[in-house]
Amino acid sequence: MTQLTHFDTAGQAHMVDVGDKASTHRVAVATGTITMQPATFTLVRDGSAKKGDVIGIARVAAIMATKRTADLIPLCHPIGLTKVAVEFALDEATATVACTVRTETRGQTGVEMEALTGVQVALLTIYDMCKAVDRGMVIGNVKLLEKHGGKSGDWVAAG
């Protein structure tokens, strides 16, 4: 099993030194869902929620969150992102909105945390904008789908 990298030999947390790592093109893709009542889904789909364009605001929130990840996750390196793409898929049959965030950089460390943070904040934004009509929404299935680049190479989730 690989050793945890964020702890020194005394068990103290530290930020990993990436100074000697090569700068490479790095990509990460993460996803997650929020499930809601059908009436809430209709408001989101039709853009008629009281607070405005839920999907549009969630997209901007995701992009903003990716850029602030190092401020939220204590041992995460600040990264100069070169691209952030946010996509939403609406499934009327299950009243579910899926969010997928793709992050890219050319740097010394990966962008997985940025993609995951973007997804979470997008889904939290949807919850915030719709909670007045549906407090029972469920956020779930948040996961990394793939990462590319760096010393550890490529990884794609099974399934």
Swiss-Prot record:
Where is the catalytic site?
128
- InterPro entries referenced in this protein's UniProt entry, alphabetically: MoaC, MoaC_bact/euk, MoaC_sf, MoCo_biosynth_MoaA/MoaC, Mopterin_CF_biosynth-C_dom
According to its UniProt record, the EC number is 4.6.1.17
Q: Which GO terms describe its molecular function?
A: cyclic pyranopterin monophosphate synthase activity
Highest taxon of source: Bacteria
Q: Does the keyword Lyase apply?
A: yes
* Chain positions recorded as substrate binding sites: 75-77, 113-114
Question: What pathway is this protein said to act in by its record?
Answer: Cofactor biosynthesis; molybdopterin biosynthesis
Q: Which UniProt keywords apply?
A: Lyase, Molybdenum cofactor biosynthesis
The UniProt catalytic activity note for this protein reads: (8S)-3',8-cyclo-7,8-dihydroguanosine 5'-triphosphate = cyclic pyranopterin phosphate + diphosphate
Q: Is Ligase a UniProt keyword of this protein? A: no
Q: Which biological process, per GO, is one annotated for this protein?
A: Mo-molybdopterin cofactor biosynthetic process
Known Pfam families for this protein? MoaC
User: NCBIfam families, alphabetically?
Assistant: moaC, PRK09364.1
Q: Which family, according to the similarity comment? A: Belongs to the MoaC family.
The entry's function note states:
Catalyzes the conversion of (8S)-3',8-cyclo-7,8-dihydroguanosine 5'-triphosphate to cyclic pyranopterin monophosphate (cPMP).
Oligomeric state and interaction partners are given as: Homohexamer; trimer of dimers.
HAMAP family of this UniProt entry? MoaC_B
Protein name, as recorded: Cyclic pyranopterin monophosphate synthase
Q: Which organism is it from?
A: Cupriavidus necator (strain ATCC 17699 / DSM 428 / KCTC 22496 / NCIMB 10442 / H16 / Stanier 337) (Ralstonia eutropha)
**Lineage of this protein's species?**
Bacteria, Pseudomonadati, Pseudomonadota, Betaproteobacteria, Burkholderiales
From the UniProt record, report the name of the gene that encodes this protein. Answer: moaC
